[in-house]
């Protein structure tokens, strides 16, 4: 299981890299769960990240505006992102989610077939009126994406496991794998939750809070020792 760590700036990216993160995921928590950072921040982090590590960029908790989101995707690609993550926040159902994601996939695959397009739903979608999280694997498949992901939309201390059982998550992973897709799971994931995620076959685990000093994704800063501890755990399973 690969470890994805979400820094917000140059300093945190260096800490993530030093700690051994497999994927450096550039985001901006001030703008939401999958808040988008600026192109120059993505570009800077791509430049300092070793070539054998992937850089991911979030496009934001996006609205149901396929054109707007597609242009944002091109911006992330031009800035150097290897993974492009779309938070399906304003899409209320399967049809809207597919429409957004198929346009993002077309935008990216037309220029670089190797860039990984990620459809991300929310385990707590009912709290924000977003598409059902269990529909995300089918959305990703039908839209031509590479990876199906879940996170949590509301960061109030609740974790992925507060909304979906391990059986639900295993079903999510198995369905995505049956379509030939990879999976990523995130949402205030704690250290003790890594093994259950690994055991159900999750490909990537996404973390910010548990990698921060004090464990707070907003007020804390990512530190390499916390990242290294998480990486060691992931590698031990």
From Swiss-Prot:
Record field: catalytic activity: 2 D-glyceraldehyde 3-phosphate = 4-(hydroxymethyl)-2-furancarboxaldehyde phosphate + phosphate + 2 H2O
Listed GO biological process terms: methanofuran biosynthetic process
EC number, UniProt record: 4.2.3.153
Signal peptide: none
Top class in the EC scheme: lyase
Pathway in which this enzyme or protein is active: Cofactor biosynthesis; methanofuran biosynthesis
GO MF entries: carbon-carbon lyase activity
Keywords: Lyase, Schiff base
Alphabetical list of InterPro entries matching this protein: 4HFCP_synth, 4HFCP_synth_arc, RibuloseP-bd_barrel
Active site as annotated: 27, 85
Superkingdom per UniProt: Archaea
Role summary: Catalyzes the formation of 4-(hydroxymethyl)-2-furancarboxaldehyde phosphate (4-HFC-P) from two molecules of glyceraldehyde-3-P (GA-3-P).
HAMAP family found in the cross-reference section: MfnB (MF_00681)
Protein family membership: Belongs to the MfnB family.
Name of the protein described by the UniProt record: (5-formylfuran-3-yl)methyl phosphate synthase
Gene label: mfnB
């Amino acid at each position: 299981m690969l470890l994805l760590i979400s820094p917000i700036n140059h300093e945190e990216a260096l800490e993530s890299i030093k700690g051994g993160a497999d994927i450096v995921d550039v985001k901006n928590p001030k703008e939401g769960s999958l808040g988008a950072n600026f192109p120059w921040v993505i570009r800077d982090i791509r430049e300092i990240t070793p070539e054998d590590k992937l850089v991911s960029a979030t496009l934001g908790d996006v609205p149901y505006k396929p054109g707007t989101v597609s242009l944002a995707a091109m911006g992330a690609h031009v800035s150097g992102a290897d993974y492009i993550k779309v938070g399906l926040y304003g899409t209320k159902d399967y049809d809207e989610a597919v429409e957004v994601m198929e346009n993002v996939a077309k935008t990216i695959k037309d220029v670089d077939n190797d860039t990984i397009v990620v459809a991300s739903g929310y385990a707590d979608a009912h709290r924000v009126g977003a598409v059902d999280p269990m529909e995300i694997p089918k959305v990703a498949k039908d839209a031509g994406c590479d990876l199906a992901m879940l996170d949590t939309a509301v960061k109030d201390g609740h974790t992925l496991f507060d909304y979906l059982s391990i059986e639900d998550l295993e079903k999510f992973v198995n369905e995505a794998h049956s379509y030939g897709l990879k999976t990523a799971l995130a949402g205030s994931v704690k250290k003790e939750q890594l093994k259950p995620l690994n055991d159900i076959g999750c490909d990537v685990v996404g973390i910010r809070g548990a990698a921060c000093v004090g464990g707070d994704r907003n007020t804390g800063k990512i530190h390499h020792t916390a990242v290294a501890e998480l990486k060691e755990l992931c590698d031990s399973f």
